[in-house]
Amino acid sequence: MAKKSLIEKENSKKKLVKKYNLLRQFLRREIKNSLRIQDKLIISEKLQSLPRNSARVRLRNRCSLTGRPRSNYRDFGFSRHVLREMAHTCVLPGVLKSSW
């Protein structure tokens, strides 16, 4: 189980990413479409003035139950430990244990 403070920090980052996502996309598009270098510099300064944690790169995928940061399956949102336990208890529909 991950520390609650780390899980809360990740949740606050998600909120910031959601809040500034459209503005970041707009500024990136403006940089790409502008022709003058001075305009690009001004727009890039505006982009740099946004909070660091509002960048999607700074997010970390975590297990939705335990908060484990590593070995997560995107399709389910769980870590490998939780996914295995849920598959064995038949909680996840359509997930079967492989055998050959």
Curated annotation (Swiss-Prot):
It is found in: Plastid, Chloroplast. GO terms for molecular function: rRNA binding; structural constituent of ribosome. The keyword Ribonucleoprotein applies. It comes from the Eukaryota. One of its GO terms (cellular component) is chloroplast. Its main location: plastid. InterPro entries: Ribosomal_uS14, Ribosomal_uS14_bac/plastid, Ribosomal_uS14_CS. Gene3D superfamilies: 1.10.287.1480. It holds the Pfam family Ribosomal_S14. Coiled coil: none annotated. GO terms for biological process: translation. Keywords: Chloroplast, Plastid, Ribonucleoprotein, Ribosomal protein, RNA-binding, rRNA-binding. The keyword Ribosomal protein applies. Binds 16S rRNA, required for the assembly of 30S particles. HAMAP family: Ribosomal_uS14_1 (MF_00537). Belongs to the universal ribosomal protein uS14 family. Part of the 30S ribosomal subunit. This is Small ribosomal subunit protein uS14c. It comes from Adiantum capillus-veneris. The lineage of its organism: Eukaryota, Viridiplantae, Streptophyta, Embryophyta, Tracheophyta. The gene is rps14.
